[in-house]
């Protein structure tokens, strides 16, 4: 097959996208597919450019990519659909993280062009990227999720509604970009300002202590539950992408009931968000055995 991998992009997760593309491109070529690689900011990558950016490693902090946003917008509007590598591809494999690559923008553009692509459609991508909307849908579907408020909100309201500590984060970001665990009311304002650098909406969520579990979904079926043990208090950007900063255990050492319930809730979450193909649902397993998406 002729497969074009879309990667890079202008979000703070640009390096993460390249790291994903390393595995995808290598795996596809090993299986005999004809693979082209397109950065949604710069266009088709030559073999030399591939070697330069597809390194498989990610820095300990997300890169500043604001200067790339306008370039990506211009390329998507005028260049992507005109590329031979896009027009002649049997399918586009999306290796994009954050920003337009995950929020439904590129998916909607590809629907307009009429090119098949992997992953969820534009609506599912948009729903899953927006944490506030996702949590509202989870709540309505009976999926347990931590209580939350949306900024602006006073420290007094947070004390009354959520208690401390809380997690302050951009509503539409991934990889814990812009996230802070806030333990004192006097630190709330700074955390909200920091999160607002990455999104125009900021969520303040009750901190749920416990173990970090994750369940993959493939074609509507839950895969075995795994556990992630980070070196830090939370599974932050550094722990996600720095070798040795976290331990991943598959399958997780949990009871049969926890494994079954996490799988059940993952399938519900996948369906509620109208996702397609594959997804991943992360949980906190509390000391008393409760699960929270």
Description of each model-found segment:
Residues 1-123, 127-129, 133, 137-140, ...:
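ATP-binding N-terminal substructure of ATP-dependent carboxylate-amine bond-forming enzymes
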Residues 3-7, 19, 35, 83-87, ...:
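Active-site nucleotide/adenylate-binding loops and adjacent lid/helix of ATP-dependent enzymes
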Residues 118, 146-147, 223, 235, ...:
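A short, local hydrophobic-aromatic micro-motif
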Residues 183-264, 285-292:
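Phosphate-binding site of ATP-dependent enzymes
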Residues 30-33, 143, 196-200, 230, ...:
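Generic secondary-structure signature for well-ordered alpha-helical cores
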């Amino acid at each position: 097959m002729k497969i074009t991998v879309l990667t890079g992009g202008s979000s703070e997760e640009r390096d993460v996208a390249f790291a994903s593309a390393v595995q995808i491109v290598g795996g596809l070529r090993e299986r005999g597919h004809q693979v082209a690689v397109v950065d949604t900011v710069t266009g088709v990558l030559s073999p030399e450019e591939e070697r330069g950016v597809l390194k498989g490693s990610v820095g300990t902090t997300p890169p500043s990519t604001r200067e790339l946003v306008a370039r990506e917008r211009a390329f998507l509007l005028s260049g992507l659909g005109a590329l031979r590598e896009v027009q002649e591809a049997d399918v586009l494999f999306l290796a994009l993280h954050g920003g337009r690559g995950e929020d439904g923008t590129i998916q909607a553009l590809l629907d307009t062009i009429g090119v098949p692509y992997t992953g969820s459609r534009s609506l599912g991508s948009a729903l899953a990227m927006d944490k506030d909307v996702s949590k509202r849908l989870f709540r309505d579907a009976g999926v347990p999720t931590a209580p939350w408020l949306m900024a602006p909100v006073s420290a007094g309201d947070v004390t009354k509604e959520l208690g401390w500590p809380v997690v302050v984060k951009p509503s539409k970001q991934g990889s814990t970009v812009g996230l802070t665990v806030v333990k004192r009311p006097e630190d709330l304002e700074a955390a909200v300002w920091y999160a607002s650098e990455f999104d125009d909406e900021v969520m303040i969520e009750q901190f749920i202590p416990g173990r970090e579990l994750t369940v993959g979904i493939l074609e509507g079926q839950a895969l075995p539950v795994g556990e992630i043990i980070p070196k830090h208090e939370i599974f932050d950007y550094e722990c996600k992408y720095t070798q040795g900063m976290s331990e991943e255990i598959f399958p997780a050492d949990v009871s049969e009931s926890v494994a079954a319930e996490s799988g059940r809730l993952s399938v519900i979450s996948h369906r509620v968000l109208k996702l397609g193909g594959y997804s991943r649902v992360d949980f906190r397993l509390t000391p008393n055995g409760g699960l929270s998406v």
